[in-house]
Swiss-Prot record:
GO terms for biological process: fatty acid metabolic process; regulation of fatty acid metabolic process. Homodimer. GO terms for cellular component: cytoplasm. The gene is fadR. This is Fatty acid metabolism regulator protein.
Amino acid sequence: MVIKAQSPAGFAEEYIIESIWNNRFPPGSILPAERELSELIGVTRTTLREVLQRLARDGWLTIQHGKPTKVNNFWETSGLNILETLARLDHESVPQLIDNLLSVRTNIATIFIRTALRMHPERAREVLATADEVEDHADAFAELDYNIFRGLAFASGNPIYGLILNGMKGLYTRIGRHYFSNPEARSLALGFYHKLGTLSREGLHDQVYDVVRTYGRESGEIWHRMQKNLPGDLAMHSR
């Protein structure tokens, strides 16, 4: 087990998460007693208690007053906030995880972008207009792309879409910094934002579905060509 966390709390958190992932503490099992676990990891019981509370909030554990702490099946109890952690734990599955993430983005974007352009066109155009001043480099485009999708999600009037994008932010922007290092990807994205702006101005809301789907397919083709050179630190994150 290789743990790169810098603080005692970060070390304890990664130790427990990796132990769950590697079935040292399998789903459905009971964690060792607090005293035993703190000695095993090498942190104070106060630090361990804080870590356990945080992991419980993220869905990894269930803490019940007066009862042992139970390990959850995190696939059933956690949220999008653990995406980066999953990518870090299983490097071989990162391409599939990213494919799934981008597929979800495209599927829900066909709904919230159409709604935003139809119900709140002025707000949608304000969001899309931010692309006019973007600097031509990967970091700027990664931030822009996330903010445009998130902005349109909230412009749809249904904040749940925005919350979903919030949950994707960490891994989404890390992917974006690699993806948008390709000039072809940046050019395709600008064309996509421009098309959406045109559809909004002309009231062609029914064409949003096809435009978003086409962009998802074409950007996916670029991404798949780039997957052979995924940076090793794509999902690295330490507390």
